[in-house]
């Protein structure tokens, strides 16, 4: 499994690239591309990794992925076992879309804030999210001048920072060739598949062909997180999915996602989500 430096396919006839994905699951390899990515999740849920951000995505979410930001929308395990459908609408753009003079024009000077601050990505919230959802759905069926007008309306919505929640603290993106992606992706794939059980340090280190000490240093350098912190984030994301979708006790959730101590599970859950498992379950 390799990290892939993506080249977004161009149709040759459209200046603005809109992609509609409908598949059993989303593309599940960590990857990056030059274009900024604006994505609406129509149907699907799972874990998003974007830079140093690990979180849960679900139906109706809207995200900005920064230029060359390593990312993956990893669906829950059930999407790989059952006949499910993942759907999304994505617009790809950069400073070459519509030509550089367009972005340098005084009329859209306010949008430069977005270009200057988008490398870490955003989760869109509030009224802006609802407005963008409408525009993206319309854009999926539009062409010609209508598509251009909708794109300009989207740019206008993104031109101020209100309702833009930063994702990653990493804002200077490295080339995929220096990201050591093949090794890192093997590590992530192993964690996704085996996080439900105890994973000893020497076991995960062997996946990377490193000593335990070298692995800890490598992982912290690449992700800006300790291995244990990242593993806990994946487990808590899985716990959130179970609490939201299944009527099972918190204790069962604790052991099913890989924790072996209920007290520690409750402590880690609240630290990551800001709520106790019971509070989270009641909200859901």
Model-derived regions, located:
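Generic protein-terminus/edge-of-domain signal
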Residues: 1-63, 69-72, 76, 264
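Regular secondary-structure segments
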Residues: 42, 112, 133-140, 188, ...
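Short, Lys/Arg-enriched, Trp-marked, Pro/Gly-tolerant hinge/linker segments that flank
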Residues: 122-128, 140-197, 203, 207-208, ...
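Terminal helix-turn-helix DNA-binding modules in bacterial transcription factors
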Residues: 189, 193, 198-211, 217-263, ...
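C-terminal structured domain segments across diverse proteins
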Residues: 268-272, 280-284
């Amino acid at each position: 499994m390799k990290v892939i430096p993506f080249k977004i396919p161009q149709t040759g006839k459209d200046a603005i690239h809109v992609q509609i994905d409908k598949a059993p699951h989303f593309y599940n390899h960590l990857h990056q591309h030059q274009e900024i990515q604006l994505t609406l999740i129509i149907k699907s849920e799972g874990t998003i990794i974007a830079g140093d951000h690990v979180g849960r995505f679900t139906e109706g979410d809207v995200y900005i992925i920064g230029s060359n930001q390593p990312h993956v929308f990893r669906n829950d395990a059930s999407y790989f076992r059952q006949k499910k459908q993942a759907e999304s609408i994505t617009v790809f753009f950069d400073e070459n879309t519509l030509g550089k003079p367009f972005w340098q024009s005084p009329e859209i000077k306010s949008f430069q804030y977005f270009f200057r601050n988008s490398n870490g990505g955003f989760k869109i919230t509030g009224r802006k999210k609802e407005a963008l959802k409408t525009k993206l759905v319309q854009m999926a069926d539009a062409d010609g001048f209508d598509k251009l007008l909708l794109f300009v309306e989207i740019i206008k919505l993104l031109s101020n920072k209100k309702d833009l929640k930063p994702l990653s603290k990493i804002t200077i993106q490295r080339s995929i060739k220096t990201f050591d992606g093949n090794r890192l992706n093997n590590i992530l794939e192993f964690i996704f598949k085996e996080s439900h059980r105890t994973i000893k340090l020497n076991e995960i280190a062997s996946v990377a062909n490193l000593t335990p000490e070298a692995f800890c240093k490598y992982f912290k350098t690449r992700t800006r997180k300790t291995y244990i912190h990242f593993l806990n984030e994946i487990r808590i994301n899985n716990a959130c999915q179970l609490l939201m979708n299944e009527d099972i006790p918190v204790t069962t959730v604790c052991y099913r996602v890989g924790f072996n101590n209920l007290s520690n599970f409750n402590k880690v859950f609240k630290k990551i989500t800001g709520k106790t498992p019971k509070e989270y379950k009641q909200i859901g």
